[in-house]
Regions:
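C-terminal non-catalytic regions of proteins with extracellular/luminal or membrane-system context
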Residues: 1-167
Length: 167
Protein backbone atom coordinates (compact mmCIF):
# COMPACT_ATOMS: atom_id res chain seq x y z
CA UNK A 1 0.00 0.00 0.00
CA UNK A 2 2.56 2.59 1.06
CA UNK A 3 4.98 1.56 -1.63
CA UNK A 4 2.65 3.35 -4.04
CA UNK A 5 3.24 7.03 -4.64
CA UNK A 6 -0.44 7.89 -5.17
CA UNK A 7 -1.58 6.19 -1.94
CA UNK A 8 0.71 8.30 0.21
CA UNK A 9 -1.07 11.44 -0.92
CA UNK A 10 -4.57 10.11 -0.36
CA UNK A 11 -7.40 12.20 -1.71
CA UNK A 12 -4.94 15.06 -2.31
CA UNK A 13 -3.39 13.15 -5.20
CA UNK A 14 -5.56 14.93 -7.75
CA UNK A 15 -3.68 18.17 -7.02
CA UNK A 16 -0.27 16.74 -6.17
CA UNK A 17 2.70 16.16 -8.43
CA UNK A 18 3.29 12.43 -8.08
CA UNK A 19 6.65 12.71 -9.85
CA UNK A 20 7.97 14.51 -6.75
CA UNK A 21 6.71 11.87 -4.31
CA UNK A 22 8.95 9.11 -2.97
CA UNK A 23 7.50 5.91 -1.59
CA UNK A 24 8.43 4.55 1.82
CA UNK A 25 10.20 1.74 0.01
CA UNK A 26 12.29 4.31 -1.93
CA UNK A 27 13.32 6.16 1.24
CA UNK A 28 14.18 2.97 3.14
CA UNK A 29 16.39 1.86 0.26
CA UNK A 30 18.09 5.29 0.26
CA UNK A 31 18.78 4.85 3.99
CA UNK A 32 20.41 1.48 3.24
CA UNK A 33 17.87 -0.37 5.36
CA UNK A 34 17.84 -4.13 5.08
CA UNK A 35 14.43 -4.43 3.56
CA UNK A 36 12.22 -7.03 1.99
CA UNK A 37 8.95 -6.16 0.32
CA UNK A 38 6.81 -9.27 -0.17
CA UNK A 39 4.01 -8.57 -2.59
CA UNK A 40 2.42 -12.01 -2.60
CA UNK A 41 2.16 -15.19 -0.53
CA UNK A 42 4.59 -16.83 -2.94
CA UNK A 43 7.35 -14.44 -1.87
CA UNK A 44 6.32 -14.72 1.79
CA UNK A 45 7.56 -18.31 2.09
CA UNK A 46 10.95 -17.39 0.65
CA UNK A 47 11.60 -14.54 3.09
CA UNK A 48 10.58 -16.25 6.34
CA UNK A 49 14.16 -17.06 7.43
CA UNK A 50 15.20 -13.38 7.02
CA UNK A 51 12.08 -12.12 8.77
CA UNK A 52 12.75 -14.28 11.82
CA UNK A 53 16.23 -12.71 12.16
CA UNK A 54 14.94 -9.13 11.92
CA UNK A 55 15.02 -6.69 14.85
CA UNK A 56 11.59 -5.41 13.85
CA UNK A 57 9.09 -5.67 11.05
CA UNK A 58 7.46 -2.53 9.70
CA UNK A 59 4.08 -3.16 8.13
CA UNK A 60 2.75 -0.38 5.94
CA UNK A 61 -1.02 -0.49 6.02
CA UNK A 62 -3.81 1.74 4.84
CA UNK A 63 -6.61 2.38 2.43
CA UNK A 64 -6.63 3.28 -1.22
CA UNK A 65 -6.91 6.94 -2.13
CA UNK A 66 -10.07 5.97 -4.02
CA UNK A 67 -12.04 5.34 -0.80
CA UNK A 68 -10.98 8.39 1.18
CA UNK A 69 -11.67 12.09 1.06
CA UNK A 70 -14.85 14.06 0.51
CA UNK A 71 -18.00 12.08 -0.25
CA UNK A 72 -16.35 8.70 0.41
CA UNK A 73 -18.06 7.23 3.43
CA UNK A 74 -17.63 3.66 4.63
CA UNK A 75 -20.00 1.62 6.77
CA UNK A 76 -17.08 -0.23 8.37
CA UNK A 77 -14.09 1.90 9.37
CA UNK A 78 -11.70 -0.86 10.35
CA UNK A 79 -8.57 -2.37 8.87
CA UNK A 80 -9.45 -4.32 5.76
CA UNK A 81 -9.71 -8.02 6.67
CA UNK A 82 -6.67 -9.11 4.69
CA UNK A 83 -4.50 -6.51 6.46
CA UNK A 84 -5.65 -7.65 9.90
CA UNK A 85 -4.93 -11.27 8.99
CA UNK A 86 -1.47 -10.27 7.72
CA UNK A 87 -0.72 -8.47 11.02
CA UNK A 88 -1.67 -11.62 12.95
CA UNK A 89 0.47 -13.78 10.68
CA UNK A 90 3.54 -11.56 11.13
CA UNK A 91 3.01 -11.24 14.91
CA UNK A 92 3.07 -15.03 15.19
CA UNK A 93 6.74 -14.97 14.10
CA UNK A 94 7.73 -13.48 17.47
CA UNK A 95 9.45 -10.37 16.08
CA UNK A 96 8.52 -6.79 17.06
CA UNK A 97 5.85 -5.47 14.69
CA UNK A 98 5.40 -1.78 13.91
CA UNK A 99 2.25 -0.74 12.07
CA UNK A 100 2.50 2.36 9.88
CA UNK A 101 -1.08 3.39 9.17
CA UNK A 102 -2.05 5.71 6.32
CA UNK A 103 -5.76 6.42 6.36
CA UNK A 104 -7.76 9.52 5.61
CA UNK A 105 -9.97 8.99 8.65
CA UNK A 106 -9.69 7.54 12.14
CA UNK A 107 -10.32 3.81 12.11
CA UNK A 108 -11.15 1.28 14.80
CA UNK A 109 -7.88 -0.46 15.69
CA UNK A 110 -9.06 -2.57 18.65
CA UNK A 111 -8.59 -5.85 16.82
CA UNK A 112 -5.12 -4.93 15.53
CA UNK A 113 -3.65 -3.30 18.66
CA UNK A 114 -2.80 -6.54 20.53
CA UNK A 115 -0.68 -7.69 17.58
CA UNK A 116 1.31 -4.46 17.14
CA UNK A 117 4.19 -3.30 19.34
CA UNK A 118 3.89 0.25 18.00
CA UNK A 119 1.54 2.23 15.78
CA UNK A 120 2.60 5.24 13.72
CA UNK A 121 -0.51 6.85 12.25
CA UNK A 122 0.69 8.97 9.32
CA UNK A 123 -2.69 9.82 7.80
CA UNK A 124 -2.45 10.85 4.14
CA UNK A 125 0.23 13.43 4.69
CA UNK A 126 1.07 14.53 1.18
CA UNK A 127 4.22 14.69 -0.89
CA UNK A 128 6.72 14.26 1.98
CA UNK A 129 4.94 11.41 3.77
CA UNK A 130 7.68 8.87 3.08
CA UNK A 131 10.56 11.05 4.26
CA UNK A 132 8.83 12.07 7.50
CA UNK A 133 7.63 8.53 8.20
CA UNK A 134 11.09 7.01 7.80
CA UNK A 135 12.59 9.82 9.92
CA UNK A 136 10.16 8.91 12.70
CA UNK A 137 10.92 5.19 12.36
CA UNK A 138 14.66 5.87 12.66
CA UNK A 139 14.19 8.14 15.66
CA UNK A 140 15.40 11.27 13.86
CA UNK A 141 12.19 13.03 14.88
CA UNK A 142 9.67 12.44 17.64
CA UNK A 143 6.19 12.33 16.16
CA UNK A 144 3.93 14.15 18.57
CA UNK A 145 0.86 16.28 18.69
CA UNK A 146 -2.78 16.20 19.59
CA UNK A 147 -5.27 14.18 17.62
CA UNK A 148 -7.81 16.33 15.80
CA UNK A 149 -10.54 13.74 16.32
CA UNK A 150 -11.51 10.71 18.40
CA UNK A 151 -10.71 7.17 17.39
CA UNK A 152 -13.56 4.69 17.84
CA UNK A 153 -12.83 1.41 19.60
CA UNK A 154 -15.29 -0.38 17.32
CA UNK A 155 -17.28 0.58 14.23
CA UNK A 156 -20.51 0.33 16.26
CA UNK A 157 -19.44 3.43 18.22
CA UNK A 158 -19.79 5.67 15.18
CA UNK A 159 -20.78 8.46 15.23
CA UNK A 160 -19.11 9.66 18.43
CA UNK A 161 -20.58 12.85 19.83
CA UNK A 162 -19.07 14.81 22.68
CA UNK A 163 -20.40 18.00 24.27
CA UNK A 164 -23.76 17.42 22.64
CA UNK A 165 -26.65 19.48 23.97
CA UNK A 166 -29.31 17.34 25.62
CA UNK A 167 -31.77 20.20 25.86
Amino acid sequence: MLCEHHSLMGSWSGDGDVTRVKSIKDVLIERKAKTVFPESDYLWDGILPMVRMADAIVLTLGESRKVTGEMNSLAKIELPGEQLEFIKRVHALGVKVIGVMAFGRPIALSEAEPYLDAILYVWHSGTKTAESTVSALYGDINPSGKLPMSFPRFTGQVPIYYNRSKG
